[in-house]
Amino acid sequence: FLTGRAMHSCFYSTAYWQKPHELKMDNKIWQGADLIFDLDGDHLPGVTDRDFPGMLDVIQDQAYALWNDFLEPEFGFSEDFLQVTFSGHRGFHLHYRDPALFHLDSEARRELVSHIRGEGVDVQGGLTRYNDAKANGWTKRIRTQIPTLIEKLVLIAERNDEANRIMKDLHLSLKETLRREGKPGKGPTSIQKLADMFLHEERRNAVENGQISRLGALQGLFLDLVKSDASIVLGAAGETDEVVTIDVRRQIRWPTSLHGKTGMRVTEFQFSRLDRDGSNPFDALTEAFVFGRDKNTNVEIVVDDATLRFGENNYDVTLGDKLNVSESAATFLSLKGWAKVVI
């Protein structure tokens, strides 16, 4: 069927029906649905798909952390029911098929997503087990994230070359977290005040050891930043992919099919390969291209700037650049609207 009717993209239902052959949805009789976690790199704070390799690295790390920090230790999910796929474009799917969870309705699935995102999480309470190396979930993420956040705040306080970018990223993440929780927003001025407090070495060391009270009136802001900077991103701008997880009638891309916006294959692989620091990490920009690899196609770049990688070949391109690339690369660039083929 598929070879005879080439189509833009191919999907299948993650729901189970008593009468799937019925034409009307009301007559199919819903029986349950798989759990889908769709992590998409689009619109991540500080990340752009114009740096396509960098974006995929970030979202691959997020997908691995989602399973390693939450789904397995917090919820007891088993790898026996897990299918991992590269979406063919900007992210990864964690497809969980445990029959014991098929019955979960949208509200139950929304609660699961809310916990992962840290909505309503008591970061202050998590500090009670700050030095417990065996703690998982949000306690673990709080413990590991505080030193990282402090490093960022110190760079802001020192007016480092990276200060503006770091400030923008932190502010965007914080703004989204506070919006979801219905809290009043905090601007860059407040973050700058907090950052300046970390120029004091003794205070910095105390906070790194979990003594958040040393920040006085700004400790609440610090804890909100910890939460927002450590949260798992389940969607573009915090919305799109939550819908994927809570939707009990969702369709998802068919593994081995091609993504119509890139020409890349929706690729299934073992969970262990999701770890970029592992012995055999999955590399979408090598493994998901299916067309020719020989450099025999001339293209002209039609966007201002982009960072690209096709296998071992890296490119930093700008408007008007002309490249000789493989059929796979030319297909990707054309479908993305980033280049045109030159005869």
Listing of model-derived features with the role each one plays in the protein:
Residues F1-S87, P99-S106, E111, G118-A230, ...:
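Signature for HUH/AEP ssDNA processing cores
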Residues H89-G91, S328:
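A generic structural motif
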Residues G337-I343:
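A short, conserved structural fragment
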